[in-house]
Amino acid sequence: MNLRASLTATLMLAIVTFLSACDTTGSPGPGVTRIISTTSFGMCMGYCRTQLEITPVKAVLVREPGGRGAPTLPVQRFERPLAPGEWQSLAQSAASARFAGLPETIGCPDCADGGAESLSVTDARGTKAVNFDHGKDVTELQPLLNQVRDIRASLTPKE
């Protein structure tokens, strides 16, 4: 092979490699390592903020007091191991979530004390996140959002 053909082949291989590495889906990659969901309410009494962190082995929910009349409440922490296959299902839903095209904030989270919610997914390429009105559906994220909300409900104490 002459030098020109060799350089052309090398250049083509580099272009194909570069293009195949581009993320055109806007979805987290298959190596999802963490999913975080938060809720917050600006004008509330009692536990006003929560953070749910889900990793391949467990789910941890932290509830923090805030608002009016709650400064003496302790921070609460609840955790449970994930059931067999639960992380795989979450990671698959996270990898299928369509963050591309979504703005960083949807609607007006916590306006008129409706509460705010967020969802973020971390993989080897970084973190994709979105904030939105508490309890609202986000079609592009819905399967994952449903699973995360179910885990939050399972860890939240009945008051």
What name fits each language-model region?
Residues 2-7, 22-44, 49, 78, ...:
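Short, well-ordered, aromatic-rich surface patches in folded extracellular/luminal domains
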Residues 9-18:
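Bacterial N-terminal signal peptides
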Residues 27, 38-71:
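N-terminal secretory signal peptides
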Residues 63-101:
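A short-motif feature that recognizes glycine-rich, charge-decorated loops
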